């Protein structure tokens, strides 16, 4: 099994990578402002089986919101509904501020291609986070340190090649004999950009969709699969993330049900220091 250990960057190489710009992720999520719409382009570096990686699409939408001149505060939540396939090439983002008050903003984003129907529909909430009482009842899941875990072998999809997945528990065993009963859909793993990049809201958004489909774990095989609707909640702002100063997250994901072609997924993204950065949930289609 090729685990890429020989190609893992040394510490000095990692530092050098962090200084290089632009990162492939930033190139893939670049948007430009037009007269009334924002424009972006799909990236071959973040491609899935039949379209762009949904996490990169969501991060691109979030970038358009963060870069918008009317934006105030930090993201609290982003919901992305993948309405139709996205073709390779350029796309337009119609970004609208729906409602704003002194502390929060509500946004709507529609993605179209070539003047056609809406391919992706998103809603977002931004807010000014103010000092308050804080309490985190949940604790960081136990995990072998990142440096003591092996990288997961790369798969055919180009987007997978952009991440370093290191499973602590629940590594998918593709190619093994199908189980007589469904296996556990739970997994715990470290996720980082293969070329190190400081974790920010954009990378959190993308990583929240970087879990392999839960059905792949339960059935020990790849089946036709696609996210229909994804929501990610952010529990830190830009200042919190800057203080964490990290390039990797500890991620956990699980599912509660697979039924009549649809299954759920819930996940958490943690900093190595034990801070819960984001939680996420989605509903996905499968054919099996």
Where in the sequence are the language-model features?
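A cross-taxon signal for low-complexity, glycine/charged-rich
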Residues: 1, 7-11
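Accessible peptide chain termini
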Residues: 1-2, 17
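Terminal targeting signals and extreme-terminal segments of soluble enzymes
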Residues: 15-288
């Amino acid at each position: 099994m090729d685990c890429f250990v020989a190609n893992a960057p040394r510490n000095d190489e990692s530092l050098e990578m962090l200084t290089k710009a632009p990162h492939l992720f930033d190139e893939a999520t670049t948007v430009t402002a037009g007269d009334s719409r924002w424009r972006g382009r799909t990236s071959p570096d973040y491609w899935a089986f039949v379209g762009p990686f949904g996490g990169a699409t969501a991060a691109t939408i979030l970038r358009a919101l963060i870069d918008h001149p009317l934006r105030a505060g930090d993201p609290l939540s982003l919901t992305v509904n993948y309405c139709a396939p996205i073709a390779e090439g350029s796309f337009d983002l119609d970004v609208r501020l729906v409602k704003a008050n002194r502390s929060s903003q509500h946004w709507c984003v529609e993605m179209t291609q070539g003047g056609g129907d809406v391919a992706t529909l998103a809603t977002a909430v931004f807010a000014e986070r103010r000092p308050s009482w804080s309490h985190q009842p949940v604790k960081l899941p136990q995990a072998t340190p990142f440096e003591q875990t092996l990288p997961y072998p790369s798969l055919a999809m180009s987007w997978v090649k952009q991440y370093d997945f290191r499973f602590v528990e629940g590594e998918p065993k593709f190619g093994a004999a199908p189980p007589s009963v469904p296996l556990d859909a739970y997994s715990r793993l470290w996720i980082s950009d293969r070329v190190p990049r400081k974790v920010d809201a954009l990378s959190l958004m993308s990583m929240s969709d970087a879990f392999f489909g839960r059905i792949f774990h339960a059935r020990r095989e790849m089946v036709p699969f696609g996210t229909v609707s994804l929501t990610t909640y952010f529990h830190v702002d830009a200042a919190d993330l800057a203080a964490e100063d990290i390039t990797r997250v500890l991620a956990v994901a699980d599912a509660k049900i697979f039924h009549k072609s649809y299954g759920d997924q819930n996940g958490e993204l943690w900093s190595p220091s034990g801070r819960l950065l984001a939680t996420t949930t989605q509903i996905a289609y499968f054919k099996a």
